[in-house]
């Protein structure tokens, strides 16, 4: 393989120019993130009274919608619907750089559309902050980054574990495992940072509301967590040829 061919393979030019399904994949990422953000932030709207949102309700809404979408779109694009997941999969060479970049753009546009729909469909006195994620005022931005990196690490690590194509021991539902990791992250960290775990999820409402406070935290934290999860899984835990398929209990 020539140096030029090697660079093209790493970047993934053929994934864009020769893959007939690339547009289906990008539309799937757009729609998946659209539904994630619209359904997810819909659960945070401040209706008040008996319909006031609770932490448990929000946590399970985000977890269940991701599990559902993974079943619906997983066979088309892998249903990343999260730049941190996409970047984590870049680290393990499961997706090329160029294809990953196109995925991330589709995810961000879908997130904006999802947030815009909820704003348009919700009474103005209920919208509140439109689910814009924010750091507890008692925390520093650095602490917010650490929390977001932590909970996103768990999410992306689970994605790698259940999507490892050399494993043959997975007996449960991979989408459910991913969804529950998101629910767990929310239950743990909503009070800290709003538990974004997903730059696109924070980006969409921020664009629609024009609220950029600490937005960088919701990019740096999840991306760092995704990169670390991808690197750790690839270095220490990815099933390789000749390895035992699973731990023998």
Curated annotation (Swiss-Prot):
Family matches, as InterPro entries: Aquaporin-like (IPR023271), Aquaporin_transptr (IPR034294), MIP (IPR000425), MIP_CS (IPR022357)
Motif (NPA 1): 82-84
GO cellular component, one term: plasma membrane
Tissue expression from the record: Localized in tracheolar cells associated with the Malpighian tubules.
Primary localization class, coarse: membrane
Leader peptide range in chain numbering: none
Residue positions of motif NPA 2: 198-200
CDD domains named among the record's database cross-references: MIP
Membrane topology (Extracellular): 48-57, 122-138, 191-211
Membrane topology: Multi-pass membrane protein
Function, in words: Forms a water-specific channel.
Subunit structure of this chain's protein: Homotetramer.
Name of the protein: Aquaporin AQPAe.a
């Amino acid at each position: 393989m020539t140096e030029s061919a090697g660079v093209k393979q790493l970047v993934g030019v053929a994934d864009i120019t020769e893959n007939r399904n690339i547009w289906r994949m990008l539309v799937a990422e757009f729609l998946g993130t659209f539904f994630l953000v619209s359904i997810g932030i819909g659960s945070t709207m401040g209706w008040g009274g008996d319909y006031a949102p609770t932490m448990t309700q929000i946590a399970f809404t985000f977890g269940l919608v991701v599990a559902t979408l993974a079943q619906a779109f997983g066979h088309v694009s892998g249903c990343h619907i999260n730049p941190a997941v996409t970047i984590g999969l870049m680290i393990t060479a499961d997706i090329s750089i160029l294809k990953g970049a196109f995925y991330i753009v589709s995810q961000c546009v879908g997130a904006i559309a999802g947030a815009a729909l909820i704003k348009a469909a919700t009474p103005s006195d209920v919208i509140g902050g439109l689910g814009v994620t924010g750091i507890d005022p008692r925390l520093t931005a650095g602490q917010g980054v650490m929390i977001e990196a932590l909970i996103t690490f768990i999410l992306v690590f689970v994605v790698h574990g259940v999507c490892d194509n050399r494993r043959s021991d997975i007996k449960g539902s991979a989408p459910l495992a991913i969804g529950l990791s998101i629910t767990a992250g929310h239950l743990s960290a909503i009070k800290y940072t709003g538990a974004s775990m997903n730059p696109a999820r924070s980006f969409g409402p921020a664009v629609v509301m024009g609220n950029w406070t600490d937005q960088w935290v919701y990019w740096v934290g999840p991306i760092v967590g995704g990169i670390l999860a991808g690197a750790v899984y690839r270095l220490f835990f990815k099933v390789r040829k000749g390895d035992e398929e699973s731990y023998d209990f």
